[in-house]
Regions:
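Membrane-interface transmembrane helices that cradle and orient dolichyl/undecaprenyl
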Residues: 157-175, 202-210, 287-305, 346
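Membrane-interface alpha helices of multi-pass inner-membrane proteins
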Residues: 172-188, 194-201, 232, 237, ...
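Hydrophobic/aromatic-rich transmembrane helices and adjacent perimembrane loops
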Residues: 192-193, 317-319, 323-358
Length: 549
């Protein structure tokens, strides 16, 4: 009798949709956290360090572009500045913020599915697919990059657009436009997503499904409200920088510099890399990609509005990925479209089975495929490898683990008033140590490449700032990827800096770049430090200003 009662209780649990739904959400969150756990402490890569440092500058009252230079849109810096209110300037702190921030994106995508008349199971399958895809090494989902950051306002913009149609609300249309603008002000390629959201809301509004439910006031009224939100936020961003006295710098580094940056990119030559990255993504996540593509093909074949909208969203996502150097983190922009397609596609596939028990078993099997295949293919990333080993695997020979050693030394041997100049692009040293740069040029390649007409002027400006600030420490990063000299630009700044260092500074520490992490070398005799690092190809050298200089 007890065994029969146990079976009845078990079946009652699986027949209760509320309990099943709650258990499914618990499973999704456990999988989401579990997939990210091993990568939470990966040393920050170059962009993360730069975003974090500029976030610190903002918190100290500074202004991006005027007080610290990068050529990304400003949104990401302010998001980092907000994150630093709660999270420490460490790899684990930044990546814990990403874990929570990205969880909001996951929930927003679930909301998009439900607002698009998807079932709870389609929403959960979308959430699971996004949990897996967004943590994937193929998209460098462990890094708090602009690509990962823009996904939340993108998902919220989609959800707001659907709410605007459902509620016949111009306020939600305005919010959708403003959120789409936020995507653009996090990464310029977000313009493809903004245009897509605008087109999708018009397409969905005209669909028979929504026409039968509730009419919007008019297509023109909705479009006007959406555009008003988009331009209101954009004008607010531009106006803010001009009011703060940084308008010219904002204009140059966001648009003029990026024009020259784009001239150094050849899309044709990046196609093999693009193709290889797409193949790797498909190989690692065959169930998700297959279900998403199947959903799109079926939707187009039967002229289903959701399938057509997913096709447009997927094309826009690819358009956002293509410009540039096809770096792996660019492909994070594909994850929402693929996750939505997988959620709807897997639901359609499993609903073809008539038996409820068989359908539940098929759903469980699909979920195992979604999660199990990528983990089985890359156990090292998800379970075995250390944080430093993962950093070297993805970014070698970049000295990202070694920057922690350098930052720790500087933090312990200086005060917050002391300034540091880094000949290289390793702003994470400044971020970890909480020290200010002696120059606003914390990114070096605008000074070392001839495609930028003002590179020589910027060298002079950097030199003027260095001599005026008299930094306590000068850090020289002997890694090509940190300097990106094109072999043609006049390295006048480097020569001036080395003469300056020879006269007034002494070598006090060095970190050789080694696997998985080079260790700090210190000695009172600088000659012995130089001797110890002589056999290493890549190094970080730390010079301190002499007390009599």
């Amino acid at each position: 009798m007890k065994r029969k009662n146990s079976k009845k209780t078990s079946w009652r649990f699986f027949s209760d949709p509320v309990l099943v739904h709650a258990a499914a959400w618990i499973a999704v969150w456990c999988i989401y956290v579990g997939l990210r756990f091993n990568s939470i402490s990966i040393p920050l890569e170059r962009d993360e360090g730069l975003f974090g440092y500029i976030g610190q500058v903002i918190r100290d009252g500074g202004l991006p572009y005027r007080d610290a230079i990068d050529h990304k849109p400003p949104g990401v810096y302010y998001i980092y500045a907000a994150a630093l209110l709660l999270f420490p300037p460490t790899p684990a702190g930044v990546h814990l913020f990403l874990l929570l921030y990205n969880a909001l994106t996951l929930m927003a995508l679930y909301g998009v599915v439900r607002l698009a008349r998807g079932s709870p199971s389609a929403g959960l399958l979308t959430a699971l697919s996004y949990a897996v895809l967004s943590s994937s090494p193929q998209v460098e989902g462990f890094a708090a990059s602009t690509e990962m950051i823009l996904l939340l306002p993108l998902a919220l913009s989609l959800a707001s657009a659907l709410l605007a149609i459902r509620w016949s609300s111009v306020v939600m249309a305005f919010a959708s436009g403003a959120l789409a603008a936020a995507v653009v002000w996090i990464k310029h390629t977000g313009i493809f997503f903004a245009l897509t959201v605008f087109c999708l809301q018009l397409a969905v509004q005209q669909s028979a499904d929504f026409q039968r439910s509730r009419q919007m006031r008019s297509s023109a009224g909705y479009a006007a409200a959406w555009l008003a939100g988009f331009f209101a936020l954009s004008l607010g961003v531009v106006g803010y920088f001009y009011i703060r006295g940084g308008g010219d710098d904002f204009l140059y580094w966001n648009f003029i510099f990026n024009y020259y940056y784009g001239t150094g990119q050849d899309i044709v030559s990046s196609l093999p890399k693009l193709s290889a990255s797409l193949r790797a993504l498909c190989t690692a996540h065959p169930v998700i990609v297959g279900a998403a593509l199947g959903c799109v093909v079926f939707g187009v074949a039967v002229r289903d509005v959701r399938g057509l909208c997913l096709l447009l969203f997927l094309v826009a996502s690819l358009a956002a990925v293509v410009p540039g150097y096809a770096y792996p983190h660019y492909f994070a922009q594909l994850t929402p479209a693929l996750a939505l397609g997988a959620g709807f596609g897997l639901e359609r596939f499993t609903n073809a089975v008539a038996s409820a028990r068989l359908r539940q078993g098929l759903i469980a099997l699909c979920c195992c495929g979604v999660c199990g295949v990528p983990v089985w293919q890359d156990v090292g990333y998800y379970v075995r490898s250390s944080s430093d080993e993962l950093s070297k695997r993805f970014f070698s020979p970049n000295p990202f683990p070694e920057t922690i050693e350098a930052a720790t030394y500087i933090a312990h041997n200086s005060t917050q008033r002391d300034k540091v100049f880094i000949f290289g692009s390793e702003a994470q040293i400044l971020f970890y140590s909480r020290r200010k740069s002696a120059s606003r040029f914390v990114l070096l390649y605008p000074l070392t490449r001839t495609i930028y007409p003002q590179h020589r002027l910027h060298q002079q400006q950097a030199w003027d700032e260095i001599t005026q600030s008299r930094p306590t420490y000068v850090v020289v990063v002997n890694v090509f990827q940190s300097v990106l000299w094109d072999g043609k630009a006049d390295l006048w700044l480097y020569r001036q800096l080395m003469d300056f260092v020879a006269q007034r500074y002494e070598l006090v520490a060095a970190v050789p770049v080694a696997y998985p992490r080079g260790r700090l070398i210190t000695h009172p005799d600088s000659n012995k430090i130089a001797k110890e690092i002589a056999d290493y190809k890549y190094t970080i050298k730390i010079f301190r200003r002499r007390y009599d200089a």
